Amino acid sequence: MSNLRFACVALLLGGSLAVAAAQNAPSPPQPPAPPQQHIKIAFVQIDGDPRYEPVRGYTRTILKTPEHPYTGAEIGIDEAAPLTRLLNTDFTLDRISVKSPAEVAPAVLAAADAGTQFFLIDAPAEAYQALVTALHGRDVLLFNVSAPDDTLRRDLCSVEMIHVYPSRAQLMDGLVQYLVSRKWSNLLVFEGPTPEDSAMAAAFSHSAQKFGAHIVADQHFKPGTDPRDREQNEPALLSAINRDFDVVVVADSEFDFVRSVPYHLVRPRPVVGSIDLEPVAWHWTWERNGAPQVNSRFEKKAGGHHMEGPDWAAWIAVKMIVQSALRTHSADFAMQRAFILGDNDFDGDKGLAVSVRPWDHQVRQAVLLAAPYEVVGSAPIEGFLHQTNDLDTLGDDQPEARCHLNK
């Protein structure tokens, strides 16, 4: 019996010693943590860009205070913060300011040489030819967040560019779809003297022809109060034509003459284009698809300033970059680029998902039809159908496009 007891005690002691030895044994080496990855995004703007000068009335009263859309990019970065640990990736945003359009290309080239591969470009059209020439063949993506010019999509045709901001063709197609859907098909156009006015009027004319609307007259106005120019600067006289019309469409990039058009026509007609009902990429009164949350975050960050089209474009550009890293589980530029340019959708909080057209790198997106304090509609309007994607009823569809990057 004593021998049995001794054996049991020995067994217990042996087990305890084995456990203690196991506890005191050094842990096996852990694999090293993967290095933190970094995705750098640069926002490039021009100080003194005339597009962001305060818009003043005749007595120098400030009517509009447009701002660079940097805050839109910032809220995109803020939204990415929870993903930093999950992806083991830092997203950083640098702001690059230059003094003229000619300085954009050298600044972007220098940043690319320093390792930045994603650029949000807030510049007018004249900056882009030198930019795409300097960056051609580089591992970069240049996101146009504020220039609507159709020539950038049709003639520049760069594989490095993504046009996040809607083209004039998209905006005017959205407006005309709405007018035609309301059976307002006879249109009187007031066209201003600037190149921007001419471009807007030309885009509108193309859209009217595309969707079966009829321009009854194109009246050229001359801003000012000179009584000798009354026939060109008074809406009542400009609208006194011998044909009826349903709507007056005004192309006035300087927001000067257009303010006198509503309620000063010879017939009581709606006014659209540069005032009252405008086709826009975004509007602060949009209340669907998560828009109130986006607007709230933006206004808090911007000190109460309302979110506008370029702000939305900067925000969704950052979101596309972040989502490409999340959904590919990679910070590799080639993989991200392929995902962004592939047949993939992104939620732009405008209802229909946004994506990049392969033929001209224009982002497909809804166009909001906005009155001053309400979004009255969203294009594509119901009934305007496309064989593959109804968003391709807005802007240059592949068969009519001059740019074919996918060939």
Language model: regions and residue ranges:
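C-terminal segment of classical bacterial N-terminal signal peptides
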Residues: G14-A21
